[in-house]
Amino acid sequence: MHYCVLSAFLLLHLVTVALSLSTCSTLDMDQFMRKRIEAIRGQILSKLKLTSPPEDYPEPEEVPPEVISIYNSTRDLLQEKASRRAAACERERSDEEYYAKEVYKIDMPSFLPSENAIPPTFYRPYFRIVRFDVSSMEKNASNLVKAEFRVFRLQNPKARVPEQRIELYQILKSKDLTSPTQRYIDSKVVKTRAEGEWLSFDVTDAVHEWLHHKDRNLGFKISLHCPCCTFVPSNNYIIPNKSEELEARFAGIDGTSTYTSGDQKTIKSTRKKNSGKSPHLLLMLLPSYRLESQQSNRRKKRALDAAYCFRNVQDNCCLRPLYIDFKRDLGWKWIHEPKGYNANFCAGACPYLWSSDTQHSRVLSLYNTINPEASASPCCVSQDLEPLTILYYIGKTPKIEQLSNMIVKSCKCS
């Protein structure tokens, strides 16, 4: 009797060891892709809090330019962030709202004069002031998730220095002579003579303050990092510094200050070339009807370690390409832009060895034996995900939304 019990136990032990070496149940690639496509269908509707796709309406002959501008700015901003994370091997914040956020664009009032106007005679060589009217968003102040200030740096071939460190400040309302007049936000090193580029700054705190206290909205100041004095150790002298002029030029801010009143041709050319590049704010807000879901529907992501920044072996867990065409794969015509996107998915084997130092290895093996359909051993899953910006129509109303965690960028065994 004891011999039979012992034999049965040894057999069970060998079976569980064999099972513990396996990974998730394997799927053929076609089936895996079909499941991924259906998951994306449900994911998009869920993030938009829709139970079914909007009714099909005839596509508009022409999308309003301001709508396209918001869509392009949001898409470009996300691409810039993704490039920076890839270069530095970083991750986004661990807490990211699961549901889609509405995106609003607020342009800075144009400083370019009309054709017959005389350009302003004053010029601030050491800094620039940028102001925005956010009063229209005050009713949604509590829904603000993020605010980005974007300004396009122009190429300045006549710059006296090739590189400058520019700083962004929030202008403060002075209570008295001793109170600060500005608050530092961020800085960037720019190449003054290089091709133009978009610069982005996180100004969430400043805009949040403006939405709650309208009288504190005095705008932003772009200036140089310039210490007021230099200490000379050899003779203990303190030499006052002459302020360095701001050589960086910005679309929508600079352009008329150096022109004469007769240079109307240059003004016209500048206006046309820099069209769509004026400074603006991108505000991302969680709609009120999704605010309640924000607390209970967040997805947490692990921090990306340097160990994960490697090239996966093709046979093992790695990133697999998958392009989703909204019309072909989902049968949807209501998403205007983009027409599709690279969703990708994770697949491949995850080696899993029996280890005596695994605290619950025997428990997990027994669990596998009792429930072979479930997986207690590592599976190939998504690690880094990026958001997707879409432009769609509900009826004849255009809407722009940012959908988080839609693009799989890397995988891991977990």
Curated annotation (Swiss-Prot):
Entry annotated with the keyword Metal-binding: no
MF terms (GO), sorted A to Z: amyloid-beta binding; cytokine activity; growth factor activity; protein homodimerization activity; signaling receptor binding; transforming growth factor beta receptor binding; type II transforming growth factor beta receptor binding; type III transforming growth factor beta receptor binding
Keywords in alphabetical order: Cleavage on pair of basic residues, Disulfide bond, Extracellular matrix, Glycoprotein, Growth factor, Mitogen, Secreted, Signal
This protein's record includes keyword Iron-sulfur: no
SMART domains, A to Z: TGFB
Signal peptide feature range: 1-20
Gene Ontology biological-process annotations: cardiac epithelial to mesenchymal transition; cardiac muscle cell proliferation; cardioblast differentiation; cell migration; cell morphogenesis; cell-cell junction organization; collagen fibril organization; embryonic digestive tract development
Any single Pfam family the record assigns to this protein: TGF_beta
Residue ranges the record marks as coiled coil: none
GO cellular component, one term: extracellular region
Residues carrying a glycan: 72, 140, 241
Disulfide bond sites: 309-318, 317-380, 346-411, 350-413
PANTHER family, alphabetized: TGF-BETA FAMILY, TRANSFORMING GROWTH FACTOR BETA-2 PROPROTEIN
Family: Belongs to the TGF-beta family.
Assembly and oligomerization: Interacts with the serine proteases, HTRA1 and HTRA3. Interacts with ASPN. Interacts with MFAP5.
Protein name: Transforming growth factor beta-2 proprotein
Organism of provenance: Bos taurus (Bovine)
